[in-house]
A protein has these predicted regions:
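A conserved acidic beta->alpha catalytic loop
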Residues: 2, 10-18, 33-35
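Catalytic donor-sugar/metal-binding loop of nucleotide-sugar-dependent glycosyltransferases
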Residues: 167-188
Length: 324
């Protein structure tokens, strides 16, 4: 199902994006004086478009570096109209450009996220910023909630002060009783960070944004599961160096690696699970998972990012987008 209309939002574009979009029949909106990046650009576009739409209409918002699956719109529209979902978000898959490097590791990570969404019957915790279909009545409800003081924000659809506008928008919607879903078939392929440096800044922004959103909303029935998830994640991060320390100490004391059948089968089960959850990615994804060590190093890297984000949040350091 094709979109009824395509609008390209150009924010400080210096290339031929606007001309190319218009040549394909898209409507082009240029931002004016935008200082709030993606959230500000989308807010300007929505302020222009929403007044002319009916409550029964829907708006698809997606990143420029994202390609939709052929049936994305049809599946998403059906989910919104039949299930009353606030929004239908993308199940994003990575466009890997290497076999065992940074982009391949992100590919496996995204494959596991897609598997987890399938296991949870499409129940989404966050509507991905890569692509999401939103019913107009829900977007208007968000604006009214912000203007009426029920929600944080400045009276627009997207908060202007959140590092992760998609995360914050999902939280706002859930506080108003809306639901979110990412059903099978609503997949997209998106670009990923090509280097560790750019990945570091991206994930630092994501995690800092998630923590800041929880701080802004406080402890409520809606945020409680998110708080619990964050606490458990950080406990797991703290346990990892303790586990490694115990093993190293045992090797030093005994001169051999500590061995036990329970630990062997537990480790084997973990490896099988990690391989099984990326099987949709083909042979390269399976080989990377079987190697184990690259993904362990990747996990340690992310642990450092999460700890850095928590430290920045506790110190209340400036929140801003970083670019390598």
């Amino acid at each position: 199902r094709p979109a009824d209309a395509v609008i390209v939002v150009c924010d400080r574009c210096t290339d031929g994006t606007a001309e190319l979009a218009e040549s394909y029949g898209a409507r082009v909106l240029h931002t004016v004086g935008n200082t709030h990046r993606k959230a500000g650009a989308l807010n300007q576009a929505l302020m222009t478009v929403l007044p002319s739409l009916a409550d029964t209409d829907s708006v698809l918002m997606m990143d420029a570096d994202t390609a939709l699956a052929q049936d994305f719109l049809a599946i998403a529209e059906e989910r919104v109209t039949t299930c009353g979902a606030f929004a239908v978000g993308a199940i994003f898959l990575a466009e890997a450009t290497d076999t065992f490097g940074v982009t391949a590791l992100q590919r496996n990570e995204y494959l596991r996220y897609a598997h987890d969404l399938h296991r949870r019957h499409a129940r989404a915790e966050v509507i991905s910023g890569t692509a999401g279909l939103f019913p107009v009545h829900a977007l208007r409800g968000i604006v009214d909630g912000r203007r009426g003081g029920k929600l944080p924000g400045e009276g627009y659809v997207y908060s202007l002060h959140s590092l992760t506008e998609d995360n914050e928008l999902t939280m706002a919607a859930k506080h108003l009783g809306y639901k979110a879903a990412s059903p099978d078939g609503c997949t997209v392929v998106t670009e990923v960070m090509p280097t560790l440096k750019t990945l570091f800044y991206q994930r630092l922004r994501w995690q800092r944004g998630a923590l800041s959103t929880l701080r802004d909303y406080g402890l409520t029935r809606t945020t409680l599961p998110y708080f619990i998830r964050q606490v458990l994640m950080y406990l797991g991060i703290m346990f990892f160096p303790f586990f490694v320390t115990v093993i190293v100490h045992a090797v030093i004391e005994t001169g051999r690696f500590p061995w036990s059948w329970p630990w062997f089968f537990a480790s084997l089960l973990l490896i099988v699970e990690r391989v099984w959850t990326v099987r949709a990615g083909g042979l390269r994804a399976l080989i990377l998972a079987i190697l184990v060590l690259p993904e362990i190093v990747y996990d340690i890297f992310q642990h450092y990012v999460f700890l850095r984000a928590a430290a920045d949040e506790l110190m209340r350091s400036d929140e801003h987008w970083d670019h390598a």
